[in-house]
Amino acid sequence: MSLPDLPGFERLRFDTELKSFNGLLSLFLSSPERVKASGKKVVAKSPLSPVDPIYASGALAYDPYTYETVVNVVINEDYDLTGEALDAGVNSDFNPWNMIMLGSVFSGKNKVPIDIYSTACGCGDDQIKKCWQIMAEVKGSPLQFWEIPRFESETEKWALDFLKKELQQLFKYLASQTGKEITDDALADAVRRGNLLRQDMLDLTRLLQSSAIPISALEFYIAQLIISDYAQDPEALHDSYRQLIEELEERVKQGVVAPGITSDKPTRIYLMGDETQEFQLFNIIEQYGGALVGCDSRLSLYYEPVKESASVLDALARWIWNMPHNMPTAERVKATIPYIKQQKPDAIIISNVVGSRNLPGAERLVRDIIGEELNLPVLSVETSLPLEDIEKVDYQIRAFIEMNAY
């Protein structure tokens, strides 16, 4: 696999023998050119905001939170964008993903042009709301929020009725912006295409259950990140995923381990919590004798496909409401436990990102639940922008893996 000559790539160790990953990465990096050539409206959405309605409207979904950060900071190492975010009016305690996204748009350095800002919001999404408001105002673009109620089993009927009404309002809004009505058939087709990708990720994750782990941590993590907006082309992304899965399945059949894994008997690591900008973390896990066997940062998007046999609106509403990301912390972790068990980990690493309000405040609760349910050692690491905390993270992961090596 050949990589572009960019500063961030020089710091990372990739699996150059995994030919299919080159196509997947190229698809991701070519988003700006493909979007401009499509002539379609671009709808910005946050990472965990469902995209099926956007594609049903004939528009393209775009996750600037992920793309702008990976391209501008992880790859091109443009750290000045945090200053642009501060100039835009946010506090320095915002998480770095939001800071880079906002700085990119505010400065005009965003790679993909955005026509519409529309995203789902749940509890604790005040940073997203603030950033979206500033970006839409700066660009003079239309802005719309829709709400996902917090998961509580005793409020199921009310929550689903509320969510269906929110989705119907979303459909009307997108239709007013794109000129295309979202019909049941269009929504069903978008869900079908989304389900192909969700199944791809389930299949990819299952391959990590093998004793001969066929994909390195960094490649697996990047493959997960790309699903957040379907790379503006669900069909092309599905093709890229299938090529990757087929190549990895062949490795499993032949007992070939990903070349980045350095130990003959690696400590199997499951990563949960916030997605990190510190991509070197994944190389570090393998450098000291570990191997990544699962990562739940985006798994709330594809634990289960959307049911296609029921009313598409009812099925989509129920799927959204049941996403682990929308659950209170204790319920979320408990919902994740069965999927962690399937991956047969030896240890857990919790990823916390500075400025995030995801897991840090409930870290003790998370540790207690994991200890009770899985009886596995747990390490918590905290990262911010790339390279800021790398020495501390390197030391923590090295010591953790050495203590838990078999």
Model-derived regions, located:
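Redox- and metal-dependent alpha/beta enzyme cores, enriched for Fe-S-associated oxidoreductases
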Residues: 55-83, 270-341
